[in-house]
Amino acid sequence: MVTNKDSRGKGKRKMEEGESSGRWKGAVYKRRKQAYKVVPVKPPALCVFRYNWLNSDRTNIVVGNTPRVDLITCFAQGKADNNRHTNQTVLYKFNIQGTCYMSDASAPFIGPVRLYHWLVYDAEPKQAMPDATDIFTMPWNLLPSTWTVQRAWSHRFVVKRKWTVNLVTDGRKVGSKTVDQRYNWVVGKNIVDANKFFKGLRVTTEWMNTGDGKIGDIKKGALYLISSTRGGVTGDSASTAFDVVCAYTHACYFKAIGIQ
């Protein structure tokens, strides 16, 4: 039992246990719920990785009848805007643009030439670059239009995009004034611009804790660019390799997610 002054401040009275004695004595009220502030989560920034498609000696790439395989997801580890800074990246968009023209060795031939490109996803890179023969079934080696992913490896390789670039040789080199009068009726298109922009790729790559961005750094999920030209099939062109020089520049738009 406790004692307290009454409301008039005269004397003291007895109070029972549990009885309140404040301003809100006898009032029934509800406890106010605490309001939580919603803090928006900032999504990871979109990184842009740009590079020129060149050989190790800084010369332009020459694509022939023998298909070549190049790694697109080659993001080095670092803190810059074009680096990966986590153990996982998602490639959303890919841009390739530049100019294609006939090589000097193939320019003397007359006829159409087609250049093929594929974007191929590899779910299990095995820390080594595959050959085109490991990916495609090739009924005709010189005709890329007949190539399809091998049935035994369909769970590993997926063709994300495929496109072609068309050229026409008129018997003379690019920029040459010399004309073969036998074929002066041929409308040449031996140099063309090639631009492609792909969205919605969503290629997820898991990385090891190494920094150079090569195929050996990838645990899962790599993206390749495979290129080849269509070869000759009859006559003098049956054993001819049509070579196309590609002066390309690439841009990869990706996000770095996951843990550091």
Curated annotation (Swiss-Prot):
InterPro entries: Gemcoat_MSV, GV_A/BR1_coat, Viral_coat. Encapsidates the viral genome into characteristic twinned ('geminate') particles. Binds the genomic viral ssDNA and shuttles it into and out of the cell nucleus. Plays a role in protection of the genome from degradation, virus acquisition and transmission by insect vectors, infectivity, and systemic movement. The CP of monopartite geminiviruses is absolutely essential for virus movement. It is found in: Virion; Host nucleus. GO terms for molecular function: DNA binding; structural molecule activity. Residues 1-23 are annotated as: Disordered. Residues 1-22 have a biased composition (Basic and acidic residues). It holds the Pfam family Gemini_coat. Its main location: virion. Homomultimer. Interacts with the movement protein. Binds to single-stranded and double-stranded viral DNA. Signal peptide: none annotated. This is Capsid protein. A motif (Bipartite nuclear localization signal) lies at residues 10-36. It comes from the Viruses. GO terms for biological process: symbiont entry into host cell; viral penetration into host nucleus. Keywords: Capsid protein, DNA-binding, Host nucleus, T=1 icosahedral capsid protein, Viral penetration into host nucleus, Virion, Virus entry into host cell. It comes from Wheat dwarf virus (isolate Sweden) (WDV). Belongs to the geminiviridae capsid protein family. GO terms for cellular component: host cell; host cell nucleus; T=1 icosahedral viral capsid.
